[in-house]
A protein has these predicted regions:
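Charged, alpha-helical scaffolding/interaction elements associated with membrane systems
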Residues: 34, 92, 190, 230-231
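Amphipathic alpha-helical repeat elements characteristic of tetratricopeptide repeat
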Residues: 142, 159, 178, 215-223, ...
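Conserved C-terminal helix/linker of AAA+ ATPases
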Residues: 181, 199-226, 271-275
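A short helix-loop-helix "switch/interaction" segment in the helical subdomain of ASCE P-loop NTPases
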Residues: 170, 174, 179-193, 212-215, ...
Length: 307
């Protein structure tokens, strides 16, 4: 089986990790020099390198695998996980100096689970530290924010994002044209991990294939939707999105709409109005009884605006 490009090109040291802010690089280097980490809360969009940075730090500190507990909180997010799995790990002595709990997607932990986590962090802070990652820091309770050093990871700008993806294609000997690559960028930005996966999955005989219209079995239905939008097949694209999108993806779909204003009109007035339509749809999404109907209505408004 081919090696996953996301793993092949994952940074493993501070020197290979791409920091958007030199001050953050210095801060991270300072933690490594001290030989221990504080409680940390990494926030940022999906695929921007939060978990990668956490693993870079643990690698730089040469923490024994036995002293690391990694949990994906989108799957294990209740009080029982905190009370049993995490407490059992935190309460025993480390093999080295300090144990570390890496909690991915901590914003998915239930409020009761977060309250229980606060107590564990306080009780075992001398021998166990916590690294939390989240996409939506506002979903993390203030008590956890106050116990962690916040660290927001900015997304790459779209030019750097595209260049990074193109460089990987060059390194892998993949033939690609810019229009095709741009389709993948539009479907996945700012999630670099997702974009790399999509590109690798759609390489045939060392050529990056263009997504086919209406292919619901595509590795990512959003690629097909973009092709439909570009071809003026708004109804088909709307049907595909509403049938394939999971509720937790709706925020990302609204952000996709905003990033690609050119799909909703060529004039400045049309694009300004599209921003208002998207804003209204996103604001209503969490309030209405059926968010799918709200999403569909927003797409219809955008289609009418583009005429």
């Amino acid at each position: 089986m081919k090696e996953l490009w996301t793993e092949k090109y994952r940074p493993s040291s501070i020197g290979t990790y791409v920091f958007r802010d030199e001050g953050q690089r210095q801060q991270v280097s300072g933690w490594v020099e001290e030989g221990a980490l504080p409680h940390l809360l990494f926030s940022g969009a999906p695929g921007t390198g939060k978990t990668t940075l956490a693993k870079v730090l643990l690698n730089e500190l040469e923490v024994d695998d036995m002293d690391i507990l990694e949990i994906n909180a989108s799957n294990e997010n209740n009080v029982d996980t905190i009370r049993n799995k995490i407490t059992n790990f935190s309460s025993t002595m480390p093999f080295g100096d300090i144990k570390y709990v890496l909690l991915d997607e901590a914003d998915y932990i239930t409020p009761n689970g977060q309250a229980a986590l606060r107590g564990v962090m306080e009780m075992y802070h001398t021998s166990c530290r916590f690294i939390l990652t989240c996409n939506y820091p506002q979903r993390v309770i203030p008590a956890l924010h106050s116990r962690c050093q916040g660290f927001h990871i900015e997304k790459l700008d779209i030019t750097e994002f595209t260049a990074r993806l193109a460089q990987i294609c060059i390194d892998e000997g993949v033939e690609v044209d810019l229009d095709t690559l741009d389709t993948y960028v539009q479907a996945s930005y700012p999630d670099l991990r997702k974009s790399i996966n999509l590109v690798q999955q759609n390489v045939v005989d060392n050529v990056l294939q263009r997504p086919q219209d209406g292919d619901k079995a595509s590795s990512d239905w959003m690629l097909s939707a973009i092709e439909m939008f570009k071809a003026g097949k708004y109804k088909d694209a709307r049907t595909l999105i509403c049938s394939q999108a999971r509720p937790e993806e709706y925020d990302d779909i609204y952000k996709f709409m905003y990033r690609n204003l050119e799909l909703w009109g060529n004039t400045e007035q049309q694009q300004d109005q599209a921003v208002v339509i998207i804003r209204n749809g996103m604001a209503k999404s969490s309030l209405c009884a059926d968010p799918e109907i709200n999403l569909s209505a927003t797409l219809i408004e955008l289609q009418m605006n583009s005429l």
